[in-house]
Amino acid sequence: MNTRMMFARAVAGAAMVLLTNCAWGASSADWFPVSVGLTMARPIPPFPCDNVAGLSLCLLSGEDCPVYGLQASCLSGCAESIYGVQIGAGYQCADDVYGLQIGGANVTTNLRGVQVGGLNAMRGYGLQVGAWNIVDETSFAVQIGVMNSHFWKMDASQSSARSLQVGIANRADGGSRLQIGGFNLSDDGSCFQIGLLNFHNGWITPLLGWSSK
């Protein structure tokens, strides 16, 4: 799946979730269509910071609860899960993100979608666009940025991860990957590199590098 299609599907999915769940949330006793607060601990009546199906708006920081729709914050947003869009000027975090995450720094332990920001860190499947992109464990990722990192805590030879990295500096350990950039580093696993200098399994080569290990 190419980058444009992945991004388009994430945005379309976020919009669909936002539209369909607003009406559902309004009619549910356990969910609220709108949530407004200064922080997660200081909601503004009559808009509780609780389970949200629609719009979650916090002036300082978002609340730690599930959000189906849009969560927007001036500084930072935190949520148990996001099904839609999470956006803010500062730090954005969520356990699960199914959709789009936009912020100065974005962190999630389970991504199915897109991250756009200065710093992006995730586990899961998706696209990262930012200055520094970080992926952990057996993720399937497309990383576009100044610096891209793909790390493994497990035995790299047993990793099933796949990644495409496009940036000035790219690093990946284990799995299989395609690296395109100025400087590419690959410690283990199979790789194909296109760049000014390519470091792979103890070798240093200009322009092209590859390994089937």
Each model region followed by its residue ranges:
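Bacterial N-terminal signal peptides that target proteins for export
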Residues: 2-12
